[in-house]
C-alpha cells in the first residue's frame, strides 16, 4: 500500500441522542413486579421492550404480565427460531404492546413504535446497556430507557455511568412518556 492512513476508533461511545435515561431505586428484586405494574398504570407507552437477564425470568415475567391483562409476548434464547420470529412479527405488527426479552434482541431489531425500554434487570455488561437502551427512540423519534436498580445493582449502575460519561438520574415522580 502506498500512503496508508491509520484510523483510530474510540471505545464505544454513548450515541443515544433523543433517549432519556432514568433509573428507579428499589430495595430488592421482590419490589420489581409491583413497580412495573405501577409504571404501566402511570406512564403512557406505545410499545415497550422489557429486558431480563435469564430465560426463566423472561418466561415468568411474561406469564405474570399476561395474567395482569397486558398484551405481552416474549423472545429468549430457549425458544426455537420459528417461535422467536412469530413473536417478533406479531410485536412489530402491534398485536402485542410489550415484548419481554433476554439479550437475544438487544442487537439487530428495529421497531419504530418502541418508545420505552425497561431494564427489569440491569445488564451484566456495560456494553449491553447501550444496545438495550438503543432499541427505543429509533428513526429519529424520542425514546426513554428506565432501569430498575436494587441496592445490589448500584455499583453496576455507576460503572455504566462512568463508562459512558453520563448521569442516569432517578425517574421523577412527575414523569410522563409518549
Go through each PLM region and give its residues.
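Conserved helicase RecA-like core
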Residues: 1-178
Amino acid at each position: 500500500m502506498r500512503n496508508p492512513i491509520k484510523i483510530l476508533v474510540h471505545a464505544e461511545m454513548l450515541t443515544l441522542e433523543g433517549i432519556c435515561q432514568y433509573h428507579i431505586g428499589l430495595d430488592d428484586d421482590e419490589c420489581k413486579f409491583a413497580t412495573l405494574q405501577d409504571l404501566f398504570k402511570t406512564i403512557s407507552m406505545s410499545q415497550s421492550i422489557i429486558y431480563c437477564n435469564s430465560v426463566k425470568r423472561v418466561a415468568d415475567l411474561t406469564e405474570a404480565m399476561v395474567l395482569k391483562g397486558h398484551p405481552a409476548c416474549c423472545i429468549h434464547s430457549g425458544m426455537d427460531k420459528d417461535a422467536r420470529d412469530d413473536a417478533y412479527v406479531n410485536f412489530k405488527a402491534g398485536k402485542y404492546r410489550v415484548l419481554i426479552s433476554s439479550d437475544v434482541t438487544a442487537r439487530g431489531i428495529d421497531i419504530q413504535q418502541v418508545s420505552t425500554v425497561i431494564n427489569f434487570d440491569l445488564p451484566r455488561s456495560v456494553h449491553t446497556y447501550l444496545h438495550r437502551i438503543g432499541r427505543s427512540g429509533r428513526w429519529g423519534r424520542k425514546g426513554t430507557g428506565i432501569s430498575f436498580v436494587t441496592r445490589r445493582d448500584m455499583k453496576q449502575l455507576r460503572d455504566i455511568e462512568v463508562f459512558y460519561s453520563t448521569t442516569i438520574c432517578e425517574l421523577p415522580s412527575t414523569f410522563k412518556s409518549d
